[in-house]
Amino acid sequence: MCEGEKKKDSSSGALYCVNLALRIVVLGLAVAAAALMATASQCTIFLYYGGPLHTITYKDFGPFVYLVVASSIGAFMEAIAIFLTICKKKDGTPAKVLLPLLDAAVPVLLYSATAAAFAAGDMSYCAVGKRVGVCTTAAAGNFCNQVHIAMYVSLAAGVALLVAEIVKHWPDSGKKKEGGGGGCGSDSDSDKSTPCHHGCHSKH
């Protein structure tokens, strides 16, 4: 009986650690996506039909601006969620209220931003009454490459977030309630060992 409970505790603790690690990965990827997209600028486009030079930036495309804003906000919210996950107490009402809200808001931001960015993949803009494809013009390679890298990094953040949610709601981790998530060195391990300790020595 004792060994069975210890295995359940260790399994729940491992799932908690995996979920926490994935949350940190999501945070890093969201920040990276926003930074890559925000710095994808200062690229001079030479128009084939003799039009004036045009410096293209991510700000010329609404979906890319949304990706920067949404990823930044999502990263900030994910940082708060990580803090609450690590530092919350068993009866921490703020954590119990905020965590579900954050867990619902972050995926919406990341998924919608990624979808919008991919939908605008055929980047073009109007110049001199004509529509010009950014990635088909000269000197656009660096800008297009960086934008697409940011899009795939944002997609990776969404995938990591999905895996984190799956791990969080895994059957074994569901028994671990909102308490402290104690697998990674938290003091909730000692609390969970009490029933087992009592059961082991009650017959002596």
From Swiss-Prot:
Intrachain S-S bonds: none
Stretches that traverse the bilayer: 20-40, 64-84, 98-118, 147-167
GO cellular component: plasma membrane
Subunit structure: Homodimer and heterodimers.
PANTHER family associated with the record: CASP-LIKE PROTEIN 1U1, CASP-LIKE PROTEIN 1U3
Lineage per the UniProt record: Eukaryota, Viridiplantae, Streptophyta, Embryophyta, Tracheophyta
Membrane topology of this protein: Multi-pass membrane protein
UniProt source species: Oryza sativa subsp. japonica (Rice)
Cytoplasmic face of the membrane: 1-19, 85-97, 168-204
Protein name according to UniProt: CASP-like protein 1U3
Cell compartment(s), UniProt: Cell membrane
Keywords from the UniProt entry: Cell membrane, Membrane, Transmembrane, Transmembrane helix
Principal subcellular localisation of the protein: membrane
UniProt similarity note: Belongs to the Casparian strip membrane proteins (CASP) family.
Signal peptide region: none
Region (Disordered): 173-204
Side of membrane Extracellular, spans: 41-63, 119-146
